[in-house]
Amino acid sequence: MPKVSEEYLQEKRKEILDAAFEVCRRKPAYEVTMSDIVSETGLSQGGVYKYFNNIYSVYAALIDEANLAGGLIHEIDCIMVLDESPEAKLEKLFKAAENFFSEMLISYNKILFELSTYCIQNPDADRKINGQTKAVPVFPYLAKCASEIIISQTQTGYFKPVIPLPDILTFIVSSFDGIIRDVTLNKCYNISSDGMTELDEKKLISTLYLSTMKLLGN
């Protein structure tokens, strides 16, 4: 029997994930079943289960694909070693977040939002899904790197926070979370608050950067 190449195996795996992605775009991700994915691929049940043994492994792979999209972790690492001012590096980190989030809105963000909500409500599913993910989550990593710059440069006296530093760091993380949530609801589900039209994620993140600089005394 001829040996199947690794390239072929990766192509079949990608084919199944692409099918799962399309199903998740049409219905709530947490309602997708392995049967849905088998039907979407046109493969046999065994042909799908050879690569993914349950829906949790599919979810984990989709989350990994989202976090690997665009190579943002590498971009963040490159920003962190630049010989530039702290505020310039922070601005680049926030800009990278803008671009990544904009790309996610037209691709994975609906799926990520639905799965994160599902995992919060179902701890067992959370363990089964996130226990299989391998890629570094982008936004927590970005927040960690931004925090490292802010903390270290506050310790040197470069930044002079106008309120306690822990409050600023909490503000940044909670603001990012709020922007991601509200823009996702607005653009993926057409939900908006009274008097509020379409939200612009780039303007919101840019405003967050400017607010952060003010809070840091710059």
Language-model segments: which ranges?
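Helix-turn-helix
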Residues: E15, V23-E65
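Helical hydrophobic small-molecule/effector-binding pocket
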Residues: E87-D124, K144-S147, V173-I180, T184
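Amphipathic alpha-helical packing segments from all-alpha helical-bundle domains
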Residues: C78, A88, K110-E114, Q121-T156, ...
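N-terminal intrinsically disordered/low-complexity leader segments
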Residues: M1-E11
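C-terminal peripheral helix-coil segments that are non-catalytic and often amphipathic
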Residues: N99-F100, P140, K144-T156, T170-N218
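Short helix-coil transition/hinge motifs at the ends and kinks of transmembrane helices
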Residues: V81-L82, N122-N130, N186-L199
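Hydrophobic alpha-helical connector segments
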Residues: A61, E75-Y108, L165-I172, K202-I205
